[in-house]
């Protein structure tokens, strides 16, 4: 069986991995690490929980340690939470070598980040929007080092290459060395047309050919065999009661659960409702201050909260290994979003369940999802007793009504408007 030393990683890094009890490389690591060390650009496709971060961090850290000075690599990722997670992994792996990692994400002090960038950190882990903001508004003494980096990584590349990030990504890439003078690594759980277009681009004379590797074909990547997919037919007006019954039924009363919703207001209503019903719950959505988002994740990871109500900021790449159940309370419009949500459970060979609440208006979305994953969902039989639903309905309805009143008193809607204005102001600064 191969080990990390045989892949070509530096001895100090192999020792760091061993200290973290990471001794045997996964498929994506075995194939990508040696090729990246040869200087090749790389596209890596593998399901979440398969070790993609070490597949790119390993060779980057190994080569950096040969000449540990200045800005060496930039990792761009679509969400703050994923950026924080990657920064933690770089810091842990490089701790014995006095590595300097700078986290550049929204929700944190721009001034503090600029001061850190000025000190020329070795690795910058960033969301495209915040790094673009620094490039456009900070002086050369802050961002000048970016023009000499050796690596650019796009993690969750399928999302970063969408129109949502296009302008910010262009700003970031324009500041980096040209592609002939840096290595570019793309990692994703979903190989989209945009990613394949890069894979099929003409080779560059001055560089070795691009290396592309998918652990399995895309449909297997999308849905692990250990993931059990079910649907529950639910009338729209009693969704909260069904959710409460499912969370407290015999099968799931002690389980670690992520409940996905499409809107921040729904996340807040459910969090407050379940909390008043004495469910240990936390939430994660874009209207929360960054400190609260981090606190929610820490509580969920530590099992202080067993239920996390989340919008899709949590669906991407987050490593929460113990999640046993994902509930799609609202069905997403994009089937790939469903895949990423469901990928929060059944990670790294573990089993897991994903249950989707289906109202009459969701049927076409479910059909599109089933076509995308080439698999039919089974009907969930765990909550079917109408009498039990009715019994819970009064209690849940009362809790929801009180939650809505509390949100009104707390001016939740006004806070959302203020946050939206703030986000728009930041975008206009980068326009």
UniProtKB/Swiss-Prot annotation:
Domain notes: The Q motif is unique to and characteristic of the DEAD box family of RNA helicases and controls ATP binding and hydrolysis.
Principal subcellular localization: nucleus
Organism per entry: Vanderwaltozyma polyspora (strain ATCC 22028 / DSM 70294 / BCRC 21397 / CBS 2163 / NBRC 10782 / NRRL Y-8283 / UCD 57-17)
One Pfam family here: Helicase_C
Domain Helicase ATP-binding: 33-209
GO molecular function (one): ATP binding
Protein name: ATP-dependent RNA helicase DBP8
Annotated Basic and acidic residues bias: 406-416
Top-level EC class: hydrolase
Positions of ATP binding: 46-53
Function: ATP-binding RNA helicase involved in 40S ribosomal subunit biogenesis and is required for the normal formation of 18S rRNAs through pre-rRNA processing at A0, A1 and A2 sites. Required for vegetative growth.
GO biological process: one example: endonucleolytic cleavage in 5'-ETS of tricistronic rRNA transcript (SSU-rRNA, 5.8S rRNA, LSU-rRNA)
Location of the protein in the cell: Nucleus, Nucleolus
Helicase C-terminal domain span: 242-389
Reactions listed under catalytic activity: ATP + H2O = ADP + phosphate + H(+)
Family indicated by similarity: Belongs to the DEAD box helicase family. DDX49/DBP8 subfamily.
Record motif Q motif, residues: 2-30
A cellular component annotation (GO) from this entry: cytosol
Gene3D superfamilies with a match to the protein in the record: P-loop containing nucleotide triphosphate hydrolases
Phylogenetic classification of the source organism: Eukaryota, Fungi, Dikarya, Ascomycota, Saccharomycotina
EC number: 3.6.4.13
Annotated motif DEAD box, positions: 155-158
Disulfide bonds: none
Disordered: region residues: 406-431
Encoding gene, per UniProt annotation: DBP8
Keyword entries, A-Z: ATP-binding, Helicase, Hydrolase, Nucleotide-binding, Nucleus, Ribosome biogenesis, RNA-binding, rRNA processing
């Amino acid at each position: 069986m191969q080990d990390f030393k045989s892949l070509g990683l530096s001895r100090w890094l192999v020792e760091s991995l061993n200290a973290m009890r990471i001794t045997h490389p996964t498929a994506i690591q075995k194939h990508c690490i040696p090729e990246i060390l040869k200087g090749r650009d790389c596209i890596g496709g593998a399901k979440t929980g398969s070790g993609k971060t070490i597949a790119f961090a390993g060779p980057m850290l190994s080569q950096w340690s040969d000449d540990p000075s200045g800005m060496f690599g930039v990792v761009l990722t679509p969400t703050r939470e994923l950026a924080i997670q990657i920064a933690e992994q770089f810091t842990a792996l490089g701790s014995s070598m006095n590595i300097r990692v700078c986290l550049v994400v929204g929700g944190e002090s721009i001034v503090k980040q600029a001061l850190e960038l000025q000190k020329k950190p070795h690795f910058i882990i960033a969301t495209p929007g915040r790094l673009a903001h620094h490039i456009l508004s900070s002086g050369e003494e802050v961002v000048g080092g970016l023009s000499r980096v050796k690596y650019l990584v796009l993690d969750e590349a399928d999302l970063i290459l969408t129109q949502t990030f296009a302008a910010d990504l262009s700003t970031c890439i324009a500041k980096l060395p040209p592609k002939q003078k840096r290595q570019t690594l793309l990692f994703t759980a979903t190989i989209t047309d945009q990613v394949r277009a890069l894979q099929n681009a003409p080779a560059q004379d001055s560089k070795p050919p691009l290396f592309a590797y998918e652990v399995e074909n895309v449909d297997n990547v999308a849905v692990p065999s250990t993931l059990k997919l079910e649907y529950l037919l639910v009338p729209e007006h009693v969704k909260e009661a069904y959710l409460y019954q499912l969370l407290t039924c015999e099968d799931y009363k002690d389980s670690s659960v992520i409940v996905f919703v499409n809107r921040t207001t729904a996340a807040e209503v459910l969090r407050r409702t379940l909390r008043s019903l004495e469910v240990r719950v936390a939430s994660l959505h874009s209207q929360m201050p960054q400190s609260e988002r981090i606190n929610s994740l820490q509580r969920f990871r530590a099992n202080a909260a067993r239920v996390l109500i989340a919008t899709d900021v949590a669906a991407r790449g987050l490593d929460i290994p113990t999640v046993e159940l994902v509930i799609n309370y609202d069905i997403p419009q994009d089937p790939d979003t469903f895949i990423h949500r469901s990928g929060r459970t059944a990670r790294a060979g573990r089993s897991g369940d994903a249950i989707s609440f289906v109202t009459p208006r969701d049927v076409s979305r479910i059909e599109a999802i089933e076509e995308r994953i080439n698999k039919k969902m089974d009907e969930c039989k765990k909550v079917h007793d109408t009498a039990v639903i009715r019994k819970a309905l009064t209690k849940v309805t009362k809790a929801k009504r009180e939650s809505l009143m509390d949100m009104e008193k707390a001016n939740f809607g006004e806070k959302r408007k203020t946050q939206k204005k703030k986000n728009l102001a930041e975008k206009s600064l980068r326009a």
